[in-house]
């Protein structure tokens, strides 16, 4: 079994419900168990206009190889209506394969670790929450990368009821 981390994000529709559904779908993948789920975080879109994103990270133990796991993540995105009209477009669901153990892969369809994860608080804050000692191959400790991104707004969101978010600065 490998330990994989998947970043989740959405900013169209009911983002919270979409992320919860996607986590359930990840848990149903063959030979895969969800071991941890971060809190949800609200973040502004990167290089684009649109509603704030809701982001999270899950830790998976899986026997799937990274390419197969990525293909299944893309299939889950498609099932949730994901379209790619242009870079940084608003999305119903975005699933990013961030890390698989300490694998370093660079192919036409898969790059591990995720090539921009070390630059994104919305990835690192939830990752560090569930894996405080996570290391990004070639970049160092995730928490050290996060410390360099204090200017990026990334707010942990606590829901007491499905429709009533409360913010908790992180």
Regions found by a protein language model. Give the residues of each.
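Extreme N-terminal starter segment of soluble prokaryotic enzymes
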Residues: 1-6
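Flexible, gly/pro- and Lys/Arg-enriched active-site loops
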Residues: 43-54, 64-170
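A short secondary-structure junction motif
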Residues: 9-12, 46
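Residue-level signal for inorganic ion chemistry
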Residues: 11, 37, 126
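Short, surface-exposed acidic-centric catalytic microdomains
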Residues: 21, 25-65
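Short hydrophobic/aromatic beta-strand micro-patches
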Residues: 7, 59-61, 100
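Short N-terminal binding/cap micro-motifs at the start of the first secondary-structure element
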Residues: 14-16
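Short, structured patches in soluble enzyme cores that scaffold and shape functional sites
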Residues: 8-10, 62, 128
């Amino acid at each position: 079994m490998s330990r994989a981390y998947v970043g989740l994000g959405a900013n169209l529709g009911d983002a919270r419900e979409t992320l919860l559904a996607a986590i359930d779908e990840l848990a149903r993948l063959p030979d895969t168990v969800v071991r941890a789920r971060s809190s949800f975080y609200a973040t502004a879109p990167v290089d684009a206009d649109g509603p704030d994103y809701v982001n999270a990270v899950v830790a998976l133990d899986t026997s799937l190889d990274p390419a197969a796991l990525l293909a299944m993540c893309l299939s889950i995105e498609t099932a949730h209506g994901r379209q790619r009209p242009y870079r940084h477009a608003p999305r119903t669901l975005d699933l990013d394969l961030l890390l698989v153990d300490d694998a370093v892969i660079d192919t036409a369809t898969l790059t591990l670790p995720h090539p921009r994860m070390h630059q994104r608080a919305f990835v690192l804050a939830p990752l560090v929450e569930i894996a405080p000692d996570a290391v990004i191959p070639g970049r160092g400790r995730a928490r050290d990368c996060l410390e360099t991104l204090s200017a990026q707004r990334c707010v942990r969101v606590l829901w007491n009821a499905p429709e009533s978010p409360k913010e908790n600065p992180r």
